[in-house]
């Protein structure tokens, strides 16, 4: 796979070196590898003070296991993270799977306190997949016991090293946005605690679209309308301030683009070139 990191503000890009053959072979030539994996690549926030530093994570979803390569612009090298079987990470001992429990089209990927979080698409599974970018290790994290809508979660930073979790709960046709906080390692309780329940709407299905830093982005379909006998249903976007939990309308996406992917774009990415006078 060829990959490049782009700086849209300065219209620059850096072409990454290929993964060394020996690293690729160590991951691809595996006894359990029967099919070509689907891959995803994304930026990894780094703690370095250098403005031009960046990291890239290349994730390979095999049918029975998960493998990861990580690139650092500081070392200019790829590093292989030990692959893990899905039955070790999310399925429990003694079980197996023939498909990745992370859906390539509908899953959400969230970042908080140096860790990435993914929601499993397995029905009834109460775990999040976690990757610690400092330890370069996979693990799992439990979810709140309350029944939440599938594929409708978001992880945020709640402050003081505590995790925050947003989820949508539906009951009798009414949708609520539930906000949970998980205590940090220094607190007596590390269980999820319900912080607040925010009524969203009735009759129309809301969806968590993205989350980053300060804001959560919700999508909510509006009422059906007809234009020249053709049905249209627009998607309204609502932002949620993670600190104040205040809701605000952002914009409305027309019917033709309502089901397309959406991300939050805030601040500017690290420049790929050092500042010059």
Residue ranges and their predicted role:
Residues 1-162, 169-176, 187, 266:
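A sequence/structural signal of beta-propeller blade repeats
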Residues 2, 47-48, 73, 107-108, ...:
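C-terminal closing repeat unit and adjoining cap/tail of repeat-based domains
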């Amino acid at each position: 796979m060829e990959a490049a990191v782009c700086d849209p503000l300065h219209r620059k890009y850096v072409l990454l070196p290929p993964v060394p053959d020996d690293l690729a072979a160590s991951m691809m030539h595996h006894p359990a590898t029967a099919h070509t994996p689907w891959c995803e690549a994304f930026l990894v926030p780094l703690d370095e003070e250098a403005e031009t530093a960046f990291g890239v994570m290349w994730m390979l979803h095999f049918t029975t296991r998960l493998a990861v390569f990580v690139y650092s612009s500081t070392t200019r090298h790829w590093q292989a993270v030990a692959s893990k079987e899905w039955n070790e990470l999310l399925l429990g001992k003694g079980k197996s799977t023939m498909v990745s429990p992370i859906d390539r089209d509908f899953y959400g990927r969230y970042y908080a306190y140096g860790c990435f979080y993914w929601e499993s698409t397995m029905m009834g599974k109460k775990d999040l997949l976690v990757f610690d970018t400092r330890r370069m290790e996979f693990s799992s994290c439990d979810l709140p016991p309350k029944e939440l809508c599938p594929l409708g979660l978001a992880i945020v930073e709640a402050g003081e090293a505590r995790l925050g979790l947003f989820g949508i709960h539906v009951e009798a046709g009414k949708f609520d946005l539930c906000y949970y906080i998980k205590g940090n390692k220094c607190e007596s309780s590390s269980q999820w605690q319900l912080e607040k329940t925010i009524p969203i709407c009735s009759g129309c299905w809301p969806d968590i679209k993205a989350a980053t830093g300060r804001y959560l982005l919700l999508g909510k379909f509006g009422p059906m309308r007809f234009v020249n006998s053709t049905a249209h249903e627009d998607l309204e976007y609502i932002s949620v301030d993670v600190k104040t939990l205040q809701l605000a309308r952002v914009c409305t996406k027309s019917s033709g683009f309502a089901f397309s992917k959406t991300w939050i774009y805030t601040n500017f990415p690290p420049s790929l070139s050092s500042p010059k006078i």
